[in-house]
């Protein structure tokens, strides 16, 4: 018989940087998950992507065991990395803080495609362009 699912936990954690401190510890502790076990598994799986923020969906079962699925980094984080910026604009319609090329946007769209609800690459590209626009990043080309 399959294990009964008791809940899902969605977090965004720096790759290779999961530790029992907030926000990871309290979120997992509420569901009774072994925090250190999750941290070890997550850090081992995401070690190669150090420095990126990785969204993770943790499925908690009735016997307090868990499984987790990592997603691709948020488009905003990837855009900031490509534009070599620390953060986006506070007033994106007035202050432009950086630029990215269309090739960089396509590269991000290809990377994000599995997690986006778009039919084709063009739709995914348009979503990434919209994210860039809302962050005050100009897309050239």
Swiss-Prot record:
Matches recorded under SMART domains: RL11
GO terms of biological process kind: translation
Q: Name one GO molecular function term.
A: structural constituent of ribosome
Sorted keywords for this record are: Methylation, Ribonucleoprotein, Ribosomal protein, RNA-binding, rRNA-binding
| InterPro entries found in the cross-reference section | Ribosomal_uL11, Ribosomal_uL11_bac-typ, Ribosomal_uL11_C, Ribosomal_uL11_C_sf, Ribosomal_uL11_N, Ribosomal_uL11_N_sf
Q: What is this protein called?
A: Large ribosomal subunit protein uL11
CDD domains per the record? Answer: Ribosomal_L11
| Family recorded in the similarity comment | Belongs to the universal ribosomal protein uL11 family.
Record bears the keyword RNA-binding: yes
Kindly list the cysteine pairs connected by disulfide bridges.
none
Q: What does this protein do?
A: Forms part of the ribosomal stalk which helps the ribosome interact with GTP-bound translation factors.
Task: Tell me how the protein is altered or processed after translation.
Answer: One or more lysine residues are methylated.
Which branch of life, at top level? Bacteria
Cited NCBIfam families: L11_bact (TIGR01632)
One GO cellular component this record assigns the protein to is: cytosolic large ribosomal subunit
- Could you describe the subunit structure of this protein? Part of the ribosomal stalk of the 50S ribosomal subunit. Interacts with L10 and the large rRNA to form the base of the stalk. L10 forms an elongated spine to which L12 dimers bind in a sequential fashion forming a multimeric L10(L12)X complex.
Ribosomal protein as a keyword of this entry, yes or no, is: yes
């Amino acid at each position: 018989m399959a294990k009964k699912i008791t809940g899902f936990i969605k977090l965004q954690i720096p790759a290779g940087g999961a530790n029992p401190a907030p926000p990871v510890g309290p979120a997992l502790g509420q569901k009774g998950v072994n925090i250190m076990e999750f941290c070890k598994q997550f850090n081992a799986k995401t070690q190669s992507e150090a420095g990126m923020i990785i969204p993770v969906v943790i499925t908690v079962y009735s016997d307090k065991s868990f499984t987790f699925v990592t997603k691709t980094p948020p488009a905003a984080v990837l855009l900031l990395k490509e534009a070599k910026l620390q953060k986006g604009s506070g007033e994106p319609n007035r202050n432009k803080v950086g630029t990215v090329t269309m090739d960089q946007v396509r590269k991000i769209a290809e990377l994000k495609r599995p997690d986006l609800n778009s039919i084709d690459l063009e739709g995914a590209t348009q979503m990434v362009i919209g994210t860039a626009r809302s962050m005050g990043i100009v897309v050239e080309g």
